[in-house]
Design a protein with these regions (language model features):
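Divalent metal-coordination and catalytic microenvironments
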Residues: 7, 60, 181
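Conserved nucleotide- and phosphate/pyrophosphate-binding catalytic cores
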Residues: 125, 143-242
Length: 242
């Protein structure tokens, strides 16, 4: 989904894509412009969404070299796509679709104000089959969509995709502030590391980060484990002798 500037949390699945390419996978990135439109991203402006798609293409090319791209606009124009959306919908229920709205970062009631939002989970499940992938990759917040795709597979007599979920980086603001799920989000600027932040700004944000003694729920250690170690392989910390 095109949604503005890239933050550190987005680098986690990008690094996983890079690993998969190195392992011999053919990785296709779905640049989900129509999904962004449904989810009111970038003001719902198609000029903004198209610019966001091009920005994402550039960012993935930098951090995940070797991946291929497909836009949702290209996918929805392919023969059989909307038939698959209807088949997925037919094999599910309104209750299930409502529960899956969380993949958009939305409350279950949001679909009552905008009917198109109920198409979103069915589209995301249909995307997996339209792209004919063996493995669907996404953050943990996308598990409802992947489970929907797997659950309808038996009814539609389709091969179940493998679902691979990457962890979400916690907000530097800590739990309970700004973001209800406590994940890194652009809605909390001080709790989010943008890839375009200067070293000075990154240092300032990290120096004020929520960093409890406990390992669980520590966003600084999350960055270490899920971002720095996979990206750098080894890290040396030099401390003055005391």
């Amino acid at each position: 989904e095109p949604s503005g500037l890239l933050h550190a949390g987005s680098l986690v699945p990008m690094l996983k894509c890079r690993e998969l390419v190195k392992a011999g996978f053919e990785v296709t990135i779905l640049l989900a412009d129509w999904h962004g439109y449904i989810n009111d991203k970038l003001g719902g402006s198609w000029d903004n969404l198209n610019a966001g798609v091009e920005y994402q293409r550039q960012m993935f090319s930098v951090f995940s070299p070797g991946v291929k791209f497909k836009t949702a606009s290209e996918l929805v124009d392919e023969e059989g796509y909307w038939e698959m959306v209807l088949r997925v919908s037919k094999a599910s229920s309104l209750k299930r679709m409502r529960r899956a709205l969380s993949i958009m970062g939305r409350d279950e009631s949001d679909g009552d104000k905008d009917m198109s939002k109920f198409f979103y989970p069915a589209m995301q499940a249909a995307d997996i089959y339209a792209l004919d992938v063996d493995l669907a990759l996404g953050g943990m917040d996308q598990r409802h969509a992947h489970m929907l795709a797997r659950d309808v597979a038996d009814k539609l007599k389709l091969r179940k995709p493998i679902a691979l979920h990457t962890p979400l980086l916690g907000s530097l603001s800590g739990p309970g502030r700004m973001d209800t799920d406590a994940k890194m989000s652009k809605s909390d600027p001080t709790g989010t590391l943008l890839v375009h932040d200067s070293k000075k700004i990154l240092t300032k944000k990290l120096s004020k980060a929520y960093c409890p003694l406990e390992r669980e729920g520590n966003p600084v250690l999350d960055i270490w484990q899920h971002l720095l170690e996979p990206a750098l392989a080894s890290i040396t910390i030099e401390r003055p002798e005391k």
